[in-house]
A protein has these predicted regions:
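Metal/cofactor-centered catalytic core regions of large enzymes
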Residues: 1, 22-23, 52-56
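Short, solvent-exposed secondary-structure boundary motifs
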Residues: 1, 24-29, 68-69
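Short, compositionally biased leader-like segments
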Residues: 1-12
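Small/flexible residues
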Residues: 7-9, 20, 67
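Short connector loops at helix/strand junctions that flank enzyme active sites
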Residues: 12, 31, 59-61
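Amphipathic, hydrophobic secondary-structure cores in small proteins
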Residues: 14-48
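C-terminal structural segments of small proteins and small subunits
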Residues: 45-68
Length: 69
């Protein structure tokens, strides 16, 4: 099982999930504000969510918990 690193930047309201340490060689916007990062093997290694506060209700953000296995 891989470790997932989660980073939130409040200045730009962006959440980034890093799934793998391999180098990002390509990025693809799925829809407005959602970007996938791929490595050389075309595997998803990162997910960026822009405008997080607009996408997630305020009450849900307060309850956001990260489970560590």
């Amino acid at each position: 099982m891989r470790d997932v690193r989660i980073r939130y930047d409040g200045k730009v309201d962006a959440l980034y999930l890093r799934l793998d340490d391999s180098k990002v060689v390509e990025s693809e916007a799925l829809k407005s504000g959602i970007v996938l990062d791929f490595n050389a093997k075309k595997q998803v290694v990162g997910i960026e969510v822009l405008d997080l506060k607009r996408r997630v209700p305020k009450g849900d953000l307060k309850q956001l918990k990260v489970l560590v296995a």
